[in-house]
Amino acid sequence: TQNIGKGWQGFLNYNQVSDDRYFRELTPNLAQTSLTNLSQQGGVTYNGRLGANGTISFTGFAQRFQTIQDPLALFVSPYERLPHFSMNAIKRNVGKMDFELNGSWTNFYHPTEVDGKRLVFYPNVSVPLRNEYGFIIPKFGLHYTNYSLDKAPVEATHKGENIDRT
């Protein structure tokens, strides 16, 4: 992680080996290593103030993997997130209420599986009730998720459709 300045940071985590035999040459049993998917990820984050009683943060990154395959036990590599964006905003003590907004958008990619995009949106409001003998914090929110699938098989029910969940 590297501080860029004024609330911005950049990060890079890139792992790669020369070939699928890399770990087998170190040990005869690939299961003896815990690394089968090497993360390759980089992105930026921002953390800042949202007025006197608030904060806001953004994250954007891309992530893929180098999958080390054992020819005797092949498996499907994980989905890549190309890209992923998220945002969180909190504003506290506005008329004795706290407001929060969380959201993210991710493009999932896989060379052989169904691709898709996911949108998550979660606005919520809470009313902190505190005194010297205890507290209770009622909270109301709406959690919305939308999936848009690509490359689905012809017989799939949701090919080219959006799948919503609230």
Predicted regions: what is each one?
Residues 1-166:
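Outer-membrane beta-barrel proteins and related beta-barrel translocases across Gram-negative bacteria
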